[in-house]
């Protein structure tokens, strides 16, 4: 009887943003990297973390363990707010290739000033990468240290589900691949 009056969605199957990872890779340590860190701090209000190079690449002038990038992880309402700004820059258009098989997606923007940050000549202009990790209630059992659980096959997020969520939640447009 209850199903005839309007099928209710299972609240445990609802997709939501687990985290938003923002990354600026400068490719060198020094002043440009610290200015990129200031950009991320202005955007998120959090202290960003520096990433080191894994290998020495002589052609790029990068040494192993040299700080070359800066990233920040944002969760909750702040993540949704920043994602909305980033999608507005991209005009809510993503390619099919932007979505991974595990239901996550990422994209990049050319200039951080498009997000509403005031241009500062002493900092310059940086591009940044957005990476969104989607999840459902119950996904945290896979992250526990003690008595780690597995996420069942039916509860995992597919590429198609992530694309459908993007289209419904953000009225997004998905363009064909390459």
Swiss-Prot record:
UniProt entry tagged with the keyword Acetylation: yes
Coiled-coil residues: none
Compartment(s) of residence: Nucleus, Nucleolus; Cytoplasm
UniProt gene name: RPL11
Keyword Transferase tagged: no
NCBIfam families: PRK04219.1 (NF003258)
PTM annotation (N6-acetyllysine): residues: 52, 85
Record-level GO cellular component terms: cytoplasm; cytoplasmic side of rough endoplasmic reticulum membrane; cytosolic large ribosomal subunit; large ribosomal subunit; nucleolus; nucleoplasm
InterPro entries assigned: Ribosomal_uL5, Ribosomal_uL5_C, Ribosomal_uL5_CS, Ribosomal_uL5_dom_sf, Ribosomal_uL5_N
Modification Phosphothreonine, positions: 44, 47
Name of the protein in its database record: Large ribosomal subunit protein uL5
A Pfam family hit: Ribosomal_L5_C
Record location of the Glycyl lysine isopeptide (Lys-Gly) (interchain with G-Cter in SUMO2) cross-link: 38, 52, 154
Protein purpose: Component of the ribosome, a large ribonucleoprotein complex responsible for the synthesis of proteins in the cell. The small ribosomal subunit (SSU) binds messenger RNAs (mRNAs) and translates the encoded message by selecting cognate aminoacyl-transfer RNA (tRNA) molecules. The large subunit (LSU) contains the ribosomal catalytic site termed the peptidyl transferase center (PTC), which catalyzes the formation of peptide bonds, thereby polymerizing the amino acids delivered by tRNAs into a polypeptide chain.
UniProt keyword list: Acetylation, Cytoplasm, Isopeptide bond, Nucleus, Phosphoprotein, Ribonucleoprotein, Ribosomal protein, RNA-binding, rRNA-binding, Ubl conjugation
Positions bearing N-acetylalanine: 2
Record's subunit section: Component of the large ribosomal subunit (LSU). Part of the 5S RNP complex, which is a LSU subcomplex composed of the 5S RNA, RPL5 and RPL11. Component of a hexameric 5S RNP precursor complex, composed of 5S RNA, RRS1, RPF2/BXDC1, RPL5, RPL11 and HEATR3; this complex acts as a precursor for ribosome assembly. Interacts with PML. Interacts with MDM2 (via its RanBP2-type zinc finger domain); negatively regulates MDM2-mediated TP53 ubiquitination and degradation. Interacts with NOP53; retains RPL11 into the nucleolus.
